[in-house]
Amino acid sequence: MGTIEKRSFSFRLRRSFGDGGSTNSRNSNNNSSTCTNHNNQKRCSTPLTPTSTSTGRLEVPGAASVSRRSSIYKKPDKNDGGQIHLIPDVELPLMTFADQYNIEKTLAEGCFAKILLCRHRPTNTLVVLKAVHAELTTIKEFQKEFHYNYELSHHHHILSAYAVAFQTMDYYVFAMEHAPYGDLASNIGPNGLHENACKLISEQLSSALGFMHSKNLVHRDLKIENILVFTPDFTRVKLCDFGATTKKGLLVHKVKHTWTSCVPPEQLELIKNERFQCLPVSDSWQFGILLYNILTGNPPWQSADWVKDQSYANFMKYEQRKTTKVPDNFRRFSPRLMRCFRKYLSHDPEDRCKITEVAKYMKDRWVECRISTSKSATLISPTNHDQDSCIYLNQREGRLSGDENKLRFKRMMSTYGLDIPIDQAMVRRRVWDWLSTCDANFDPDVESLHALDLLQ
């Protein structure tokens, strides 16, 4: 093979201070260098070294990158999204974290990777480094995740990946923006979120996933842990983790190490190592599970197995219109939202709706009431349209004393206009009259005192 003269482009990141976030700039330098292509391995005669400028820009700290103008990219194809499916094969420079970063803390750590909050010393920029265990993945899989994340970063609700990628002795690493409020899992309480917050989140996520689907990409691992929060009121959330992202139509295996409640039923039925066609309807299923999880704080079932999981069997009968009875764990939702769930959580993948279908239900009321799983709970429908219609009675059953339960019940009755004032003096007189007519063996003094205690 001969030598090929190419331009070496150094990606830059423009940091936006004051808004807690940053945006990527795809502009490149015009510095040229000679690159030699031997056996499809791209090597540059001029090493990529970390540099910074005084203009507020952070240049690639030891990053390997390929410009979209490089010959590895083709002219975009209107049918397949063009260059986004052409994953460049780039050699990652070898360095250590300490070369340019101060590790402030570990945000998360899993089987395959750990997430580190770091400060880039040359520019004093706070970034997040995703370090994937080199012995548990391949360089090709790492490059695919980094490439998809970077190419999708310009969408407002997809986490920005910087043009920074390198390897250490144990990890493959790339840099991302920092989400100050963590993931969605750490922001959802045991009873879920307000209906309005759920609508905000679902609208942003459907936009991000719809953008991916327009590029013929399927996320395949949609769950609350992969949604990052940038504002406390959920007006800005972003989709992350593209390790399982795949081009539509390819044959793939099941995603490992994910919640079984998020796995579509057609994938649960597969035998081990059996491959299946990757389709966007799997994201639609996971989006429906996500909606339920945000509203309630829990998944609707353990697994979408109608034989082993009774909760799913009940919903499947309702979804297929074999019964008109709404499953108990869905009774709090409005008919319009139930229609939405039917479309997203259809057992037959061919009947599932597109990911953007939720936009049709944004003006509808989603939650009519909440009911406790306790059989002794009382069902109350709200009358105030400005407050969330999520009300639980007896949600802390057994933790409150008898007096506290009485006071709590009186407050609720008074709120809904059901509290009737009682003349306690009249009650006492009637009790004494009743006691005076009792049997001669009845002790009026002792029993009347006991009765009065019960009334107070």
Curated annotation (Swiss-Prot):
Catalytic activity: L-seryl-[protein] + ATP = O-phospho-L-seryl-[protein] + ADP + H(+); L-threonyl-[protein] + ATP = O-phospho-L-threonyl-[protein] + ADP + H(+)
Region (Disordered): 15-78
Keywords in alphabetical order: ATP-binding, Kinase, Magnesium, Metal-binding, Nucleotide-binding, Phosphoprotein, Serine/threonine-protein kinase, Transferase
Activity modulation: Activated by Pka-C1-mediated phosphorylation of Ser-334.
Residue numbers carrying Phosphoserine: 334
Chain intervals with Low complexity compositional bias: 22-55
Residues that coordinate or bind ATP: 107-115, 130
Residues in Protein kinase domain copies: 101-367
Phenotype reported upon loss of the gene: Results in a decreased CrebB protein translation or stability in the brain. RNAi-mediated knockdown in the mushroom bodies results in a reduction of memory formation, including anesthesia-sensitive memory (ASM) and long-term memory (LTM) performance but not anesthesia-resistant memory (ARM) or learning ability.
Task performed by this protein: Serine/threonine-protein kinase involved in memory formation. Together with the cAMP-dependent protein kinase A Pka-C1, promotes long-term memory (LTM) by regulating CrebB stability and activity. Involved in the maintenance of anesthesia-sensitive memory (ASM) which includes short-term memory (STM) and middle-term memory (MTM).
Protein name per its UniProtKB record: Serine/threonine-protein kinase meng-po
Source organism per UniProt: Drosophila melanogaster
This protein's encoding gene: meng
